């Protein structure tokens, strides 16, 4: 099972997606890579899948990059690619607009794309390699709520997908909107908890009151 998430220019995203799902995509770099798969269904492992997406990004840049930049649009796109192929370990990659990529590790167990500066601090403080699925769901939604509150360009709904090791299928997929009872309860609880924590934090001892 392979999951591909994107952020950035929608036209570029769709062009990349077409290439990695097409049965006849061949990168200009094929001559340098033997037995390169033609689409995501043919990859032997997730690293090879990340390479394929990266090659597709560079191919789209060669085709559209200069025209986009001439119009001031820029070539901005990034992807998260994760999942598992039978017999291989689960892996997660972040692919940049240059086609290069990094992989999540035990020391850096999560990756983010898009508008993440508002929601990243809670993840940096709490998430680790042993974080449970339930805690991961809570933290992901709290992180998204922080982004939604601070950036008007980001909106609902939130699509949540859970994958468990070796299942090779979706464990759960849920679309969460503003009316979702759990999300409403969680954001209210988190807001109250932050206010309480702020009130209980010690006052500075170097300032006159």
Describe the predicted segments one by one.
Residues 63, 71-209:
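A two-mode feature
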Residues 1-66, 113-120, 124, 128-131, ...:
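Conserved short S/T/G-enriched processing/targeting/catalytic segments and their helical context
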């Amino acid at each position: 099972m392979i999951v591909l998430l994107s952020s950035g220019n929608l036209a570029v995203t769709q062009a990349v997606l077409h290439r990695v799902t097409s049965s006849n995509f061949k990168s200009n770099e094929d001559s340098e890579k033997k037995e390169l798969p033609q689409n995501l269904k043919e990859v032997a492992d997730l690293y090879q899948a990340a390479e394929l997406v990266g090659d597709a990004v560079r191919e789209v840049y060669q085709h559209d990059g200069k025209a986009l930049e001439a119009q001031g649009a820029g070539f901005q796109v990034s992807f998260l690619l994760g999942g598992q192929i039978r017999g291989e370990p689960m892996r997660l990659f972040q692919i940049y607009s240059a086609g290069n990529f990094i992989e999540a590790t035990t020391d850096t167990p999560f990756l983010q794309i898009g508008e993440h500066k508002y929601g990243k601090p809670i993840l940096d403080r709490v998430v680790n390699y042993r974080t449970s699925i339930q805690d991961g769901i809570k933290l992901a939604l709290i992180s998204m709520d922080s982004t939604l509150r601070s950036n008007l360009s980001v909106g609902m709904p939130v699509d949540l997908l859970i994958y468990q090791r070796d299942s090779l299928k979706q464990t759960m997929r849920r679309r969460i909107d503003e009316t979702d009872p759990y999300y409403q309860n969680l954001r209210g609880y988190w807001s109250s908890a932050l206010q309480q924590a702020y009130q209980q934090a010690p006052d500075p001892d170097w300032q006159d009151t």
